[in-house]
């Protein structure tokens, strides 16, 4: 199954690259093809920045290129960040070429309430593992999960599988099992929904989901695709 998934991903990536090239970088007519240089914007640092109320945001940096030319000074940065109010704020970095092509990137700054499970969590590789059948396969260090507030008392989880496919297999975020949770006063976690964008399927269930706000830890067992993922993680 893993080989089948990998092959499908490689095929769709090749198709997507072709489409981007045709749509985003070429200006074709019946008699000729004029190649137009593409602009790109890249971010330094993390995509998500977690700050306490009243904290100071230090811009990690960004860069933009038009082909091989540096056009960072042409980037327009738009932000409505308010560190004095809890919430999630987007910072948009955008550049527009003379041909009218637009490239942009976004960073999200979360002003986190310390009484909520919001933050960037790193998987405890020594105590996290996947069980397919009778085998037990441990996680590798460095996998992370982002938990963000939805603003209605529920939370968005970037990957219930703790980065198993996103980081471990290198398949990217489209193969993360993202979804939403509710956390009870006693710390018990309820999985409200889940979905893998690439495979278009969901988890069967969550077992023993627990959040310890004081300790900054989350743990759960996820049953997905006839496998069990035991994930323990600690807030950064």
Regions found by a protein language model. Give the residues of each.
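Serine/threonine-rich, repeat-prone extracellular segments and beta-strand-based repeat modules
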Residues: 68-103, 107, 112
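Low-complexity "stalk/linker" and mucin-like segments enriched in Ser/Thr/Pro/Ala/Gly
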Residues: 65-72, 191, 201
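Generic detection of short hydrophobic beta-strand segments and adjacent strand-loop junctions
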Residues: 49-51, 107-109, 179, 231-233
């Amino acid at each position: 199954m893993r080989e089948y998934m990998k092959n499908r991903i490689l095929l769709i990536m090749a198709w997507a690259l072709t489409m981007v090239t045709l749509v985003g970088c070429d200006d074709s007519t019946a008699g000729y093809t004029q190649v137009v240089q593409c602009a790109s914007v890249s971010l330094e640092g993390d995509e998500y920045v977690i700050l306490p109320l009243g904290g100071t945001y230090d811009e990690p940096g960004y860069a933009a290129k038009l082909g091989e030319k540096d056009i960072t000074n042409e980037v327009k940065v738009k932000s409505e960040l308010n560190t004095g109010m809890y919430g999630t704020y987007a910072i948009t970095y955008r550049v527009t070429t003379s041909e009218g092509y637009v490239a942009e990137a976004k960073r999200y700054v979360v002003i986190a309430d310390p009484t909520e499970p919001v933050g960037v969590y790193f998987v405890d590789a020594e105590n996290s593992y996947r069980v397919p059948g009778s085998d037990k396969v441990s996680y590798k260090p460095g996998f992370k999960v982002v938990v963000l507030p939805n603003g209605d008392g529920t939370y968005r989880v970037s990957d219930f599988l703790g980065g198993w496919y996103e980081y471990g297999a290198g398949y990217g975020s489209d193969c993360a099992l993202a979804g939403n949770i509710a956390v009870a006063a006693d710390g018990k976690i309820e999985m409200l929904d889940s979905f893998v964008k690439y495979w278009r399927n969901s988890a069967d269930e969550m077992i023993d989901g627990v959040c310890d706000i004081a300790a900054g830890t989350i743990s759960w067992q996820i049953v997905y695709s006839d496998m069990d993922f035991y994930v323990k993680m600690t807030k950064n």
